[in-house]
Design a protein with these regions (language model features):
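Long, positively charged amphipathic alpha-helical accessory segments at protein N-termini or as interdomain linkers
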Residues: 30-32, 64, 68-158
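Acidic, His- and aromatic-enriched active-site or binding-groove loops in soluble protein domains
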Residues: 6-8, 56-65
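Short beta-strand element of the conserved SAM-dependent methyltransferase core
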Residues: 1-2, 50-52, 76
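Contiguous, small/hydrophobic- and glycine-enriched helical/loop subdomains that border
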Residues: 1-40
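Short loop segments at secondary-structure junctions
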Residues: 3-6, 55, 80-83
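Beta-rich nucleic-acid/ligand-interaction surfaces
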Residues: 36-58, 142-147
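Hydrophobic, well-ordered secondary-structure segments
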Residues: 13-20, 24, 44-47, 55-58, ...
C-alpha cells in the first residue's frame, strides 16, 4: 500500500495497525483464525505480525518512508511453509538467534487447498474497502527481467 503523506512519521503506527487489521480480515474471510500480534518464538518478531490462532506467523509487515509518501509492504506466506523453515533454520543458527521453527506457517496450513488467487482476491477486496485500488500490469520486459534474475534468489529445493 503506497499513500501520499505530508508528514510520514506521524502516521507510522496507524498505517501498521490498519494494514495488519486489513490482512487479518482478508484471511478471516477465507476461514483463518487470523489475529494481529507477535507469536512466541517467531522469526523477525513484531507486534504487527499477522498470525493464525496466536500460534504461527503468516505475515510480516514493514514500512518505507520517503518525503511525501509511505509504503507499507506485507510478506504473506500462502503455501509451502516448510520451505520457509528450511531457509530460516540455518540462518538463525548461524546468527545465534533464538527461533522456533514451529512458529512459522502458511495460509495453506490453516485452510488446506487454498489457492493463491483466492488469497489475492480476498486481499484486493479488503484493500478496496479502504483505498482506491489501481491494478498495474507489469510490462513483458519487466516480467522477463524478473524471471531471468529469479534464479539468483531462489533457495535450492531438496
Amino acid at each position: 500500500v503506497a499513500t501520499p503523506e505530508e508528514q510520514v512519521a506521524r502516521g507510522t503506527g496507524g498505517r501498521f495497525d490498519s494494514v495488519a487489521e486489513m490482512i487479518a480480515a482478508a484471511l478471516a474471510d477465507l476461514g483463518v483464525d487470523a489475529r494481529v500480534g507477535e507469536v512466541p518464538g517467531e522469526y523477525c518478531p513484531g507486534s504487527h505480525t499477522v498470525n493464525a490462532g496466536g500460534r504461527v506467523k503468516l505475515a510480516g509487515i514493514a514500512q518505507r518512508l520517503i518525503k511525501g509518501c509511505a509504503h507499507v509492504g506485507v510478506i504473506l506466506v500462502v503455501k509451502d511453509s516448510e520451505l520457509v523453515r528450511e531457509v530460516l533454520v540455518p540462518v538463525y543458527e548461524t546468527l545465534g538467534l533464538e527461533w522456533d521453527p514451529a512458529s512459522s506457517g502458511a495460509v495453506e496450513d490453516e485452510v488446506p487447498g487454498i489457492e493463491l488467487k483466492d488469497v489475492e482476491a480476498s486481499i484486493l477486496h479488503r484493500l478496496s474497502l479502504n483505498y482506491e485500488v489501481e491494478p498495474v500490469a507489469l510490462s513483458p520486459a519487466t516480467l522477463d527481467a524478473a524471471e531471468s534474475a529469479a534464479g539468483r534468489f531462489r533457495s535450492p529445493v531438496p
